[in-house]
Amino acid sequence: MSSAATADLPHVARAANPARYARWTPLSGIAFVVFFVAGVVASSPPSDSASDAKWVASYTGHGNQVGHVLTGVFLILAGLSFVSFVSVLWTRISEASRPAVVNPLPLVTAGVAAACIAAGGVLMAAAAGASLTGSSPVPGPDLLRFSDAGGFTMVGIAGMLAAALCVACLSAQARAAGIFGRKLTILGLVASVVLLASFLFIPIVALLVWLVAASIVLMRSPAGG
């Protein structure tokens, strides 16, 4: 083997590693789905109409408190995963659109959505976390209801409305850049409309479906490796 060819080997290895890494970065979209679902199932607060005693009981005991804390942790991780995925997709769009400048609105709205989801998780976990560490007793039922409702408002309303705008913008940009096909573009636009009703909770499934589909498409695309 010539010395020139040998000298090129480190360069080839360095070039291959980023490509291999880039292939798997879209998994952050699927990670959001995993963390979000885990956050939902980790704890089960009572309904708003449940008795005061049931609310206090739901936050009493090591097992219950750990569950609520895990909900907060998983939602924080979900928020980080969402903004990571959007960054990956937007970067792919920006590279494919050169020399045109791509509007960074999806990055801004993804940051807002991630912050709201994480803040909602903190609100949901705060009471249980304080009690679990022994720094305070279990709060009264009214405060427990407030923290749970406030957490859902941040996640299911503020966070999902920002996510709806993000998905709509990304879908249009990815279609224009040739990254998304017609079907995935339509799925993204439909998901963004459905998310407007996210206060009903079930419509949030539309975001999960879109993230899985978009992640698979990005992993299969040539730019992914």
Descriptions of predicted regions:
Residues 2-225:
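Hydrophobic, aromatic-enriched alpha-helical segments typical of multi-pass transmembrane helices
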